[in-house]
């Protein structure tokens, strides 16, 4: 994979340099991106004189010929008008560099990095070394200094998705004092654009105010991905995390190594991920440190918990209106499982008036977790202790958890969640698979990292050491699940463990949840405790029923256990089709309305019928609540509250017994440009004179009436019948005329014979 790398960073004014109110167009022979071999770069400008240098800080020379690119180089282009230097832009080229990662190129004045006064990366002229804490005080990097830089980001396909000026800051807490540091880049109006407009993390979000270029924090000399791995697991429990994307970082054409692009947890994070306004948003961290909004609601929560005994159900129920207790439980399940001692200083929590006003917790900065240091510790007990027993569990950090555990329902919920998450997301098999996936993703890139970076590389590892750290992750994944299981027993004095074996037949036709956790597998196996009831909800899809286990609680304290194992079978069976003879006849996209037609000769009552509407990424049910009658051979229209039918893939109609009456599937989003149309059956019956119905797009909706096609068909039939009638009349008239003539001829012949 690894070839000779050449990086060219070109800086010039936004592809057009303004000169005396006229545009001066600059043309490059090569576009920014990745190339297999060295090349000559040609730069043309018909109306301006360009100068170039090999960095921001070098002396500029006139550009008279093409430039041969065969090494790592930055070329800065500029144009002067009346001694004014116009805004600079950057185009980066990578030669012989193959990667599965994104690539970031930062270009910044060396003074902004290393100058004693201006430099972000040096202690600075005011700093002094404090031997009591073993780091510099008043260092430049400890302040929120921000410097201008230019950033480019290339995606995994080699396409440039970001190219703009931005602000540059040092990012992190204690990691600021490390020789290698993380960066934050900020989009602001004063730099040009106030957002980084790209799908950085492959999600629907395409506009970011801040991006973190993180060296992996406390893990920066080990794996370079531990926090990204841990938060990828935590996100599967619905917890808020920073999305992550691995990258290679170049600064002024110098390779700095593997960094992770991360979201920043601030007000813009919630605007992006929850589409909520900033008004009414509160964000706090650590011990009541306010990041955004107000802390009044959180102080009220703490005050109530302090003054009330939460073992009293009424008091606990009130607390559930102030905080999302399931979210809080999942947060602590993950944090204690990872044995993360640094959770106290990195607690992040938030609420919004625009949602339900409840506080929720964020999994953040977990680099010290998932290690052998605290692998054998009972973190559940430590983080629910009423006294500070270690440096990482001051009483304020355990206050909420230890008080909530006084409530029996909360305690049982935490035990169940530990079992369910421990049997799924945090099972040994799941953890080993995730570690292997990250190893596969990173191993070739880390080889390049160790072999090609010169800055910071001394005493910072090798591929061999990196693989040893992978082995440590594997040991943790193999041992920690059984340790936390013992921790649960020890902390809550549990007994009577059993193994639940859950098998689901036809899982695509229903859902099963344990303690409100959807079980997506057809085969589930995991440990639980007989002293804690396990809620199970079995929900067949409309048109199906469950013919297996039918209880709402699993408690195998009786003779159901066989060798400490309880086997539960859930089987979803199709109920069959409805005898009702109604059909979906037309779907109007403008109104929107679904039209039904009664093919039967008797009345149909639609009360308690339902529509199932499947979208490209979701689904919903619409119920007919009131009594609605359809006369024989008549139509009924059902309004559907502005459903987006262009995103729909299927509509199904069920009767009051959940039996399927009719369905239609379609994909019309690519074939229409507006909503002034409908999708309809050509005829409302299963066949007419041998013609079968089909569905078509119609630009003349005919709700509660015959379709144009059906009307045309009936008119055609009428014409054909009229033609047949006329033909029959003509034949009949002809036969009568012929018969009359024959009678006349016969009469004349008879008369002549007599005379």
Residue ranges and their predicted role:
Residues 21-30, 86-91, 472-475, 484, ...:
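Intrinsically disordered, low-complexity linkers and terminal tails enriched in Ser/Thr/Pro/Gly
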Residues 66, 71, 131, 205, ...:
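Coil residues (strongly favoring Ser/Thr
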Residues 4-13:
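Sec-dependent N-terminal signal peptides
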Residues 102-104, 111-128, 133, 138-141, ...:
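Middle-to-C-terminal accessory/interaction subdomains
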Residues 106, 127-293:
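Conserved ATP-binding subdomain of kinase catalytic cores across diverse folds
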Residues 19-140, 148, 155, 162-164, ...:
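Short, compositionally stereotyped local motifs that mark structural "simplifiers"
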Residues 1-4, 752-754:
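Positively charged n-region of N-terminal signal peptides that target proteins for export
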């Amino acid at each position: 994979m690894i070839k000779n790398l050449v990086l060219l960073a070109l800086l010039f004014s936004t592809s057009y340099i303004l000169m005396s109110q006229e545009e001066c167009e600059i043309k490059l022979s090569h576009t920014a991106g990745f190339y297999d071999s060295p090349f000559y770069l040609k730069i043309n400008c018909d109306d301006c004189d360009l100068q170039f240098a090999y960095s921001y800080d070098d002396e500029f020379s006139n550009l008279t010929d093409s430039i041969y690119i065969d090494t790592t180089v930055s070329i800065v282009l500029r144009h002067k008008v009346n001694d004014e230097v116009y805004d600079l832009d950057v185009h980066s080229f990578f030669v012989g560099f193959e990667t599965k990662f994104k690539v970031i190129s930062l270009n910044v004045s060396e003074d902004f990095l290393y100058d004693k006064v201006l430099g972000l990366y040096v202690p600075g002229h005011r700093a002094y070394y404090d031997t009591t804490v073993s780091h510099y005080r008043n260092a430049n990097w400890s302040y929120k200094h921000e410097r201008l830089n230019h950033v480019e980001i290339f995606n995994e396909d080699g396409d440039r998705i970001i190219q703009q000026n931005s602000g540059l800051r040092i990012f992190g807490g204690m990691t600021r004092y490390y020789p290698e540091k993380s960066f934050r880049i900020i989009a602001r109006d004063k730099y040009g654009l106030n957002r980084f407009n790209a799908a950085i993390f492959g999600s629907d979000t395409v506009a970011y105010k801040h991006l973190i270029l993180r060296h992996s924090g406390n893990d920066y000399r080990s794996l370079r991905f531990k926090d990204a791995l841990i938060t990828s697991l935590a996100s599967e429990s619905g917890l808020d995390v920073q999305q992550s994307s691995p990258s290679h970082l170049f600064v002024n054409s110098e390779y700095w190594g593997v960094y992770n692009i991360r979201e920043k947890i601030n007000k813009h994070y919630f605007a992006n991920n929850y589409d909520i306004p900033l008004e009414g948003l509160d964000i706090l961290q650590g011990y009541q440190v306010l990041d955004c909004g107000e802390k009044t609601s959180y102080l009220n929560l703490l005050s109530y918990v302090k003054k009330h005994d939460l073992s009293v159900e009424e008091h606990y129920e009130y607390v559930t209106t102030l905080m999302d207790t399931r979210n809080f439980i999942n947060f602590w399940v993950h944090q204690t499982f990872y044995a993360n001692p640094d959770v106290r200083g990195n607690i992040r929590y938030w609420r919004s008036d625009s949602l339900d006003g409840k506080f929720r917790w964020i999994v953040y900065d977990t680099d010290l977790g998932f290690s052998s240091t605290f692998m054998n510790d009972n973190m559940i007990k430590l983080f629910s202790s009423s006294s500070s027993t270690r440096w990482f569990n001051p009483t304020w950090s355990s206050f909420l958890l230890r008080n909530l555990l006084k409530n029996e329902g909360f305690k049982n919920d935490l035990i169940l969640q530990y079992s369910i998450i421990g049997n799924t997301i945090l099972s040994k098999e799941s953890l080993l698979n995730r570690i292997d996936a990250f190893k596969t993703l990173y191993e070739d890139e880390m080889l390049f990292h160790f072999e090609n970076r010169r800055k910071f590389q001394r005493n910072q590892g090798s591929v061999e050491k990196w693989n040893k750290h992978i082995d440590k992750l594997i040991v943790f994944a193999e041992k920690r699940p059984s340790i936390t299981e013992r921790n649960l027993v020890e902390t809550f004095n549990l007994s009577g463990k059993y193994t639940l074996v859950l098998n689901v037949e036809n899982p695509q036709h229903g859902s099963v949840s344990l303690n409100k956790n959807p079980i997506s597998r057809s085969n589930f196996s995991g440990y639980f405790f007989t002293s804690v009831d396990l809620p199970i909800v079995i929900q067949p899809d409309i048109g199906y029923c469950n013919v297996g286990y039918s209880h709402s609680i699993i408690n195998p304290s009786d003779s159901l256990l066989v060798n400490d194992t309880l086997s539960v079978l859930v089987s979803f069976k199709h109920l069959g089709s409805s005898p009702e003879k109604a059909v979906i006849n037309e779907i109007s996209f403008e109104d929107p309305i679904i039209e039904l037609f009664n093919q039967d000769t008797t009345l149909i009552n639609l009360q308690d019928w339902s529509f199932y509407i499947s979208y490209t990424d979701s689904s919903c049910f619409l119920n007919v609540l009131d009594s609605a009658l359809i006369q024989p051979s008549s139509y009924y229209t059902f309004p559907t509250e502005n459903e987006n039918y262009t995103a729909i893939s299927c509509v199904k109609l069920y009767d009051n017994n959940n039996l399927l009456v009719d369905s239609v599937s379609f994909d019309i989003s690519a074939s229409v440009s507006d909503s002034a149309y409908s999708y309809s059956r050509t005829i409302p019956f299963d066949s007419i004179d041998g013609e079968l119905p089909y569905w078509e797009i119609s630009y003349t909706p005919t709700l509660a009436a015959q379709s144009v096609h059906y009307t045309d068909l009936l008119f055609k039939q009428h014409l054909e019948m009229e033609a047949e009638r006329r033909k029959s009349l003509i034949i009949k008239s002809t036969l009568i005329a012929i018969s009359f003539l024959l009678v006349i001829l016969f009469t004349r012949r008879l008369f002549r014979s007599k005379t």
